[in-house]
Amino acid sequence: MKIVITGVTRGLGRALAEWYIANGHTVAGCGRSGPAIFDLRFTHPEPHSFDAVDVALPVKVSLWAERVLGSLGAPDYLINNAGLINAPAPLWKVPADEFGKVVSVNILGVANVIRAFVPAMVERGSGVIVNLSSGWGRSVAPEVAPYCATKWAIEGLTKALAEELPKGMAAVPLNPGVIDTDMLRQCFSDGAASYPKAQEWAKRAAPFILGLGAKDNGRSASVDGFEG
C-alpha cells in the first residue's frame, strides 16, 4: 500500500510510519522537525520519502503533494495525524495566538492536506482518508477547550467530506485512544506514563487503519482497546 502520513516526526505518526515500513508498505510523510525528518530519510531511504512541511502553510503543503504524487502516485491511505494541543488553561486564559496555532494545524492543516491529495484519489476512484480525531472530539474536558473545539470540528469536517466522496472511497474520523505521547504529557505530565506507548499502539492501530474501507465511510471509528 502507498500511505501518506502527516506529523511523522514523533508520537503516533512516527509509530505508524515505522510499522508500515516494517511491514512492506511505502510511506511518504511530513513533519515540522528538520532533524527528525533527516533521521527518517537516513533510516528509511527510497522508495519512502520524508519532507519538512508545516501543514498549516497551504503553499508548502501543495508543493509537497506535487512531489509525492509525482513519484508515488495517489495514495491508498491518507492519514491526517499532525496536531497540536494548547497548554492546559481555562479558555479565557488561552492567548489568542495560541488558540490560532491549534486551529491552524488541527483544522486548516487537515483541509490543506485534503485539498492537495484528495483530487488525485478521486480521479483514480479509490482511497481512504483517515483524520485523527480524539476522545475529546466526542466528549469534553476542562482546560483543553481549543483542542476539544478542533477535534469536534474534525468529526464534522470528515463526515461532511464523506458525503462528497464518490462511491468506493471513504473518509473516517478516528479516535486513536489515550496514548503516552509528548502531547499527552502536556496535559497529564508524568501521569501519561501509565498509558500505552505509541509503538505498542501502532501494532494494533496500523493494521486497523488498513482494514478501513468504503464500508466505513463517514463512521466515527476508534482503535479497539485504547479508548480509555
Regions found by a protein language model. Give the residues of each.
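C-terminal helical subdomain
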Residues: 167-169, 173-176, 181, 190-228
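Conserved glycine-rich Rossmann-like NAD(P)H-binding loop of the short-chain dehydrogenase/reductase
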Residues: 23-38
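Conserved glycine-rich cofactor-binding loop
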Residues: 9-10
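Alpha-helical segment proximal to the catalytic Tyr-Lys
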Residues: 119, 163-164
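Residue(s) in the substrate-gating loop at a strand-loop-helix junction
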Residues: 134
